[in-house]
Amino acid sequence: MGLPWYRVHTVVLNDPGRLLSVHIMHTALVAGWAGSMALYELAVFDPSDPVLDPMWRQGMFVIPFMTRLGITNSWGGWSITGGTITNPGIWSYEGVAGAHIVFSGLCFLAAIWHWVYWDLEIFCDERTGKPSLDLPKIFGIHLFLSGVACFGFGAFHVTGLYGPGIWVSDPYGLTGKVQPVSPAWGAEGFDPFVPGGIASHHIAAGTLGILAGLFHLSVRPPQRLYKGLRMGNIETVLSSSIAAVFFAAFVVAGTMWYGSATTPIELFGPTRYQWDQGYFQQEIYRRISAGLAENLSLSEAWSKIPEKLAFYDYIGNNPAKGGLFRAGSMDNGDGIAIGWLGHPVFRDKEGRELFVRRMPTFFETFPVVLVDGDGIVRADVPFRRAESKYSVEQVGVTVEFYGGELNGVSYSDPATVKKYARRAQLGEIFELDRATLKSDGVFRSSPRGWFTFGHASFALLFFFGHIWHGARTLFRDVFAGIDPDLDAQVEFGAFQKLGDPTTKRQAV
């Protein structure tokens, strides 16, 4: 049977045994990829600096997902939060990866068994003697089992009743750790940034799934509904399954890109909106104001700012700055961050503090403009020196650093001042090592960007797939050109055709 590549799935159309086999093989491939990818990432991952070189800067993709579910230790003797450990236990990163690979191998063998032994009694309709599947019953079974898994995850794993809990952090991604989470049953449970909503929603959705599964196991669909939705056709199952998958893909693309409790910034990197809104900058200034109110000097106040918080306030960590098709991790772009140089404070010769206007997300280049506290432009780096009025040289701008490696150092040399003004456009200033990885200086996106792009793209494709297969199953008689209720002998081109009421027809 010479089938074109896009029609090969017809070989499992009326063969339940081999339909099961190919799905088990698909599970084997998915689990095998997950385990293998985890081992590859562990081989290249450097856990030595969780503050300035976290997993998302190194381009890790599956390690963040394991971590958010409660895995933090490695058989290599390190912990994701820093430091060393002596007894990581069986459920380390390597343990989870190994479990996926073993599971993949077992699924591979099961797929082969079901391909060879396809003609099982369980798939045979005792009334007709032909292979058939009771699809509404199978739907009920799957709904019930997925409901049990969903409820179990929310009630046991997330709450810590039997499991580690999940990754929980503060709003600024500084204190993250794995901990048990209590369900949030009030209105706060609908806040996407409240971890308790993860527990309560899984418990609620799982309960609903269990009840719905039992309903579909005990109640048969009405005949009109069964026929109207083509519930006996396996392509109906394909269409509705694709709908479930693309809907989920759109949802997770949103929760990843806009941020939520399920996508902590310590594991996936900050969102672009945190740069756009000056989210971390505002928190830093709030802490500085609080420090000054406690009679600390500027230098002391800035020295108390966590390096982790300052690093989030850097445009190179904005996932929207990397192009969609620039391969590689963030470290391959602007380099590996080594240390925070400190916060530069610019002043003109009259002593006014000046603020460098920050680069918006979608600009590659941006004019260097310094404004005072009232937003009035006081200095810039001009494009045409002949027409300049506010150049650094003319205004006499100086820069002094507070906190970081250059704490207390000041510069009045215009070339140096301009250098740091340009760098201040990009947020807090860091020393970056571009030699080790031969980084090219062009920003890359974080796993947050890749995940969003991949899931949004495939969701769109799967949406079209849902429409396609839904239309095929609902209008199969129209596409075939023959009425499914027709039992008269027909000859193509001579007898009953679509829209020809004169041809012979005998209704059932």
Curated annotation (Swiss-Prot):
SUPFAM superfamilies in UniProt: Photosystem II antenna protein-like
Topology in the lipid bilayer: Multi-pass membrane protein
Keyword Hydrolase annotated: no
Single GO molecular function: chlorophyll binding
GO CC, any one term: chloroplast thylakoid membrane
Keywords: Chlorophyll, Chloroplast, Chromophore, Membrane, Photosynthesis, Photosystem II, Plastid, Thylakoid, Transmembrane, Transmembrane helix
TM segment ranges: 21-36, 101-115, 140-156, 203-218, 237-252, 457-472
Protein's cellular compartments: Plastid, Chloroplast thylakoid membrane
Chief localisation class: plastid
Note describing how the cofactor binds: Binds multiple chlorophylls. PSII binds additional chlorophylls, carotenoids and specific lipids.
Biological process annotations from GO: photosynthetic electron transport in photosystem II
Presence of keyword Signal: no
Family: Belongs to the PsbB/PsbC family. PsbB subfamily.
PANTHER family per UniProt: PHOTOSYSTEM II CP43 REACTION CENTER PROTEIN, PHOTOSYSTEM II CP47 REACTION CENTER PROTEIN
Function per UniProt: One of the components of the core complex of photosystem II (PSII). It binds chlorophyll and helps catalyze the primary light-induced photochemical processes of PSII. PSII is a light-driven water:plastoquinone oxidoreductase, using light energy to abstract electrons from H(2)O, generating O(2) and a proton gradient subsequently used for ATP formation.
SUBUNIT field: PSII is composed of 1 copy each of membrane proteins PsbA, PsbB, PsbC, PsbD, PsbE, PsbF, PsbH, PsbI, PsbJ, PsbK, PsbL, PsbM, PsbT, PsbX, PsbY, PsbZ, Psb30/Ycf12, at least 3 peripheral proteins of the oxygen-evolving complex and a large number of cofactors. It forms dimeric complexes.
Protein name: Photosystem II CP47 reaction center protein
Organism the protein comes from: Lemna minor
Organismal lineage: Eukaryota, Viridiplantae, Streptophyta, Embryophyta, Tracheophyta
